[in-house]
């Protein structure tokens, strides 16, 4: 008997907001999604703040969203966990952080704090940097340098001067710390193996290779004057003294808590074998600490070790001997695999993974179609194999193009995805399968910051849609991302495990 596949389609960054001239989702011509909303049951899901284990009012993100969806429960995020440790005082007694600081003190070497300096809360939080500076002061350190990576995506695109001024004021108040180098996240936090970008930030940190500016704030404002916003600020030197260079024996704490954009820079400092660019011997080895576990294969101590999630959706499907497929392009591949599986690198038994390369362009407004059509082509081909019971698919376009702040490109991104959705749904229904369509967080439904008049490049706290497209009749109630996995299990007629505390969104009378 042919399989009737169940598909979960995640349109990354597709939130709900009133129609308006800066809502790319509403401006786009989406005949396929419009028809599905008219015909099939749909509801709204909360995907920010406490609903996904974040502080109240904190926007969700792709990592958090996929963790919650795959776990079928609210997963308390590293942001919440670390912030709570600071509030409780446990942070300042963390053994890994204490050891790193005491080693630096004993060696008479410098401590370098590197990470994203904003309160975006997606990859890092500036309050965690302030806590590290407080801790360094308590530990009696005096040579402490900050290597500031600039955001411009999870916060406004031209706000780094404000964050750097705040950081500078905080170092003066605490009495320790100095901004040594500054780099846009485009360089320092690449995740697509564009090592030439990482090298620019690395060389600034270890060789002082870059423009020397009077101070961090004036350097950033000079970039603004040249039309370069935060994300793309070319690495520069803000404190040219010799000690601010990273040297062998120094301590380093990378305070980003989200792994995907921290891995490459971390590997540049800690990996023994490193073929991507030349590293001076003067900068190795260092005593490197990761705030969270960036990758099991990275050989560096972790300040906040991962908490294990039992009975994720992928594990339950494997336990029931079902065949599952995860498919996405490069930008969201980690999300439908690593994050969806609760931070597990290894696939479940019966879990196949397909990675479609993302296009090699500087920014995705230049190619808003990204690789959506190639993903769709491959999925259509795999659906014909009659192999899979469950498919997890992510379309990256709404999020990645939304982040550029370019409205017409975001509209094109949404129209591209709509065409792909139409093709996939038609195929799934022809196999008498079911397609659930949702998102992990909002983004492209807000493309302008009405307060500043600047393009809005961050995520939103808006709810996201959830549709069930099926030959069977269903009714739904509102919920949260954690309710998706229990819903999928009910559609598969599989009992929900106790570890999953989400609730099925189905309110069918025949339940």
Per-region residue spans from a language model:
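Feature captures the catalytic ectodomains and active-site-proximal regions of enzymes
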Residues: 1-511
């Amino acid at each position: 008997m042919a399989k009737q596949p169940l598909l979960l389609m995640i349109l990354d960054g597709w939130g709900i907001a009133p129609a308006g001239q800066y809502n790319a989702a509403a401006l786009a011509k989406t005949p396929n999604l419009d028809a599905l909303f008219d015909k099939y049951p749909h509801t709204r899901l909360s995907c920010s703040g406490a609903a996904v284990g974040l502080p109240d009012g904190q926007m969700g993100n792709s990592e958090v969203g996929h963790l919650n969806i795959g776990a079928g429960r609210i997963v308390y995020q590293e942001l919440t966990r670390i912030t709570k440790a600071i509030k409780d005082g446990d942070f300042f007694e963390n053994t890994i952080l204490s050891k790193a600081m005491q080693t630096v003190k004993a060696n008479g070497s410098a401590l370098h704090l590197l990470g994203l300096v904003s309160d975006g809360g997606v990859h890092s939080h500036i309050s965690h940097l302030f806590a590290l500076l407080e801790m360094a002061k308590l530990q009696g350190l005096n040579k402490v340098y900050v290597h500031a990576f600039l955001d411009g995506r999870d916060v406004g695109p031209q706000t780094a001067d404000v964050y750097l001024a705040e950081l500078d004021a905080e170092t003066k108040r605490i009495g320790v710390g100095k901004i040594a180098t500054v780099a846009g996240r485009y360089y320092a936090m690449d995740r697509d193996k564009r090592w030439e970008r990482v090298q620019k930030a690395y060389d600034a940190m270890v060789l002082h290779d870059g423009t020397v500016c009077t101070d961090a704030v004036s350097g950033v404002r000079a970039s603004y004057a040249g039309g370069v916003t935060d994300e793309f600020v070319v690495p520069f030197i803000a404190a040219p003294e010799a000690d601010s260079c990273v040297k062998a024996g120094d301590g380093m704490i990378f305070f980003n808590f989200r792994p995907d954009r921290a891995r490459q820079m971390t590997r540049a400092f800690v990996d023994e074998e490193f073929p991507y660019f030349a590293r001076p011997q003067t900068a190795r080895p260092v005593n490197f600490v990761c705030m969270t576990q960036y990758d099991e294969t990275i050989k560096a101590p972790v300040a906040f070790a991962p908490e294990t999630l039992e009975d994720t959706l992928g594990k339950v499907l494997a336990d029931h001997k079902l065949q599952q497929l995860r498919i996405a392009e490069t930008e969201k591949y980690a999300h439908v695999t690593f994050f969806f599986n609760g931070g597990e690198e290894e696939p479940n038994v019966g879990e196949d993974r397909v990675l479609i390369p993302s296009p090699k362009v500087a920014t995705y407004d230049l190619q808003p179609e990204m690789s959506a059509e190639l993903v769709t082509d491959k999925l259509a081909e795999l659906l014909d194999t009659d192999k899979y019971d469950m498919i997890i698919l992510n379309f990256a376009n709404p999020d990645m193009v939304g982040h550029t702040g370019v409205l017409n490109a975001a509209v094109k991104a949404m129209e591209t995805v709509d065409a792909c959705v139409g093709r996939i749904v038609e195929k799934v229904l022809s196999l008498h399968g079911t397609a659930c369509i949702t998102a992990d967080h909002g983004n492209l439904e807000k493309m302008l910051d009405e307060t500043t008049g600047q393009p809005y490049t961050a995520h939103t706290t808006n709810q996201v849609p959830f549709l069930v497209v099926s030959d069977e009749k269903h009714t739904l109630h509102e919920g949260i991302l954690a309710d998706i996995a229990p819903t999928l299990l009910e559609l598969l007629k599989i009992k929900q495990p106790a570890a999953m505390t989400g609730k099925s969104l189905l309110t069918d009378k025949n339940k």
